[in-house]
From Swiss-Prot:
Described purpose of this protein according to its UniProt entry: Ribosome-inactivating protein of type 1, inhibits protein synthesis in animal cells.
PANTHER family: PTHR33453, RIBOSOME-INACTIVATING PROTEIN
Keywords: Hydrolase, Plant defense, Protein synthesis inhibitor, Toxin
Pfam families noted in UniProt: RIP
Protein name, as recorded: Ribosome-inactivating protein saporin-5
Active site: E176
Gene Ontology MF term list: rRNA N-glycosylase activity; toxin activity
SUPFAM superfamilies, per the entry: Ribosome inactivating proteins (RIP)
Protein family (similarity comment): Belongs to the ribosome-inactivating protein family. Type 1 RIP subfamily.
Gene3D superfamilies: Ricin (A subunit), domain 1, Ricin (A Subunit), domain 2
EC number annotated for this UniProt entry: 3.2.2.22
This protein's encoding gene: SAP5
Organism of origin: Saponaria officinalis
Length: 253
């Protein structure tokens, strides 16, 4: 299993961007090009199913498991308040044996299936967000926020609310920034500060399949055959979407 590490002790915007590039480079197939663009495309499913992301702070490491063929979250690993490594996983996404290979630090006895599912709505419900529209948008994004949310699960007794908030922020700061340069640029522009998320961030996040499909099936030389509206105005040039990574949809058309 490949590991990619983000050091959260005084990181720079450049280090963060190179971390995001490593995620893209690990999952992309360099030979795949969709819609006459140079946007990275995830490769077809392979034997290596998972990618391990390590967040390092001065107090220790918390790790995230992502599926390489779509960057969906499958599990996370953290020490509890007695310094025992515990792996928590979404049972529909990964088996116990696969989890052992991904996070060998946690014994089978210390693996626990999460009581909720891996979709944003289910995680948001468990995050108990009370303000605004009660979605992940209300939490904001940014490196400082990633660090504080990680520390809430690092060497602590498990608190579901803190765990769910960590997952919401960690997923966006890894998988979503890899998919969308628009979100990555917000993180680097505000680096390392926490910033308010906007509707466009959420629109991008819920439109990855839709955008990938449009580029794959209805773009030529980087131009769509018609205007597309993904929830933030009409787009004709693919480059205006600032995509970082496309979903695997088969051989180019």
């Amino acid at each position: 299993v490949t590991s990619i590490t983000l050091d959260l002790v005084n990181p720079t915007a450049g280090q963060y961007s190179s971390f995001v590039d490593k995620i893209r480079n690990n999952v992309k197939d360099p030979n795949l090009k969709y819609g006459g663009t140079d946007i990275a495309v995830i490769g077809p499913p392979s034997k290596e199913k998972f990618l391990r992301i390590n967040f390092q702070s001065s107090r220790g490491t918390v790790s995230l498991g992502l599926k390489r063929d779509n960057l969906y979250v499958v599990a996370y690993l953290a020490m509890d308040n007695t310094n025992v490594n515990r792996a928590y996983y979404f049972r529909s996404e990964i088996t116990s044996a696969e989890l052992t290979a991904l996070f060998p630090e946690a014994t089978t006895a210390n693996q626990k299936a999460l009581e909720y599912t891996e979709d944003y709505q289910s995680i948001e419900k468990n995050a108990q967000i009370t303000q605004g529209d009660k979605s992940r948008k209300e939490l904001g994004l940014g490196i400082d926020l990633l660090l504080t949310s990680m520390e809430a699960v690092n060497k602590k007794a498990r608190v579901v609310k803190n765990e769910a908030r960590f997952l919401l922020i960690a997923i966006q700061m890894t998988a979503e920034v890899a998919r969308f340069r628009y979100i990555q640029n917000l993180v680097t522009k505000n680096f390392p500060n926490k910033f308010d998320s906007d509707n466009k961030v959420i629109q991008f996040e819920v439109s990855w399949r839709k955008i990938s499909t449009a580029i794959y099936g209805d773009a030529k030389n980087g131009v769509f055959n018609k205007d597309y509206d993904f929830g933030f105005g009409k787009v004709r040039q693919v480059k205006d979407l600032q995509m970082g990574l496309l979903m695997y949809l088969g051989k180019p058309k």
